[in-house]
Each structure stands twice: as C-alpha cells, then as structure tokens.
Amino acid sequence: MSIVLKIKRTEDAKDLPLPAYMSEGAAGMDLYANVKGEVTINPGEVELIPTGIQIELPPNYEAQIRPRSGLALNYGITLLNTPGTVDSDYRGEIKLIVINLGKQPVTIKRGQRIAQMVINQVVRPKIIEVEELSETERMDRGFGHTGV
C-alpha cells in the first residue's frame, strides 16, 4: 500500500535536499540539518537542530524520528527522545533534540544527514478498564527475566 507524504520546506531551507531513502531497502529516510553554518555540540550538551521541513501525514499515520547509527557509533551523537513521534495533525517544523554522549565536541554542518524518519501506521484501540488480566507463563517477570 502506498501513501502520500506531503513535505514543505521552510523558507530558510530551500537549498537543502528533501528527505531521501539512501538504499532500496532503507526503512528510514534521512533528514538534513538546517543550521546556519555550523553548530558545535560539546560532550553532555543538548542542541535543538531544525530540519527545515514540515510534513502532512494521512490520518492514522505517524513519523518516527530516529538517530543515525553511524553518528551514534562514531561520535556519540543521538536523539534524546528516541524515537520521537510526529503526529498526523502536527504541521510545524520537525526539530531534533540532539545530545552528544561522546567524549569530544562534534560539529554539525548545514545539510549534514542528522537523523532518519520512518513512517508507520497507527492503531488506536478501544480502551476497556478491567479488574483482571489473563494469565500467561511470564506474568510480571520483566527486565532480564530471560537472562542477560
């Protein structure tokens, strides 16, 4: 099934590429940093990085904003609220909460691929409050219950 994702560039991002899939099998399309020149993020610091795009999703869809694995592995750069969710009724610019978990300052340049966006269908269930839940073999055993 194919859907339409409408993308509008902000006035200051007309020179940046539209989000793009970098391979035939890529689940996420890359997003680009819409910074003026460069932004340096020191270890432990957080910066809000604009992408220069606004999107319109069909109803019952969301965009998940995720870190790029190469930036995380090589520089310690990731997103604080990952995955970030863009709801179908949001029309503002997508901005990224970027943190440097590495040991060295990292410079983000204008037009650099900084995150990826994955589009997913959303199911909104009917919510029913109950007194009991069905039993399972696992029940409430959580964190590490199958071993580490």
Curated annotation (Swiss-Prot):
Its EC number is 3.6.1.23. The gene is dut. This enzyme is involved in nucleotide metabolism: it produces dUMP, the immediate precursor of thymidine nucleotides and it decreases the intracellular concentration of dUTP so that uracil cannot be incorporated into DNA. Pathway: Pyrimidine metabolism; dUMP biosynthesis; dUMP from dCTP (dUTP route): step 2/2. This is Deoxyuridine 5'-triphosphate nucleotidohydrolase. It is an enzyme of class 3 (hydrolase). CDD domains: trimeric_dUTPase. Its cofactor is Mg(2+). HAMAP family: dUTPase_bact (MF_00116). It comes from Caldanaerobacter subterraneus subsp. tengcongensis (strain DSM 15242 / JCM 11007 / NBRC 100824 / MB4). Substrate binds at residues 68-70, 81, 85-87, 95. Belongs to the dUTPase family. One of its GO terms (biological process) is dUTP catabolic process.
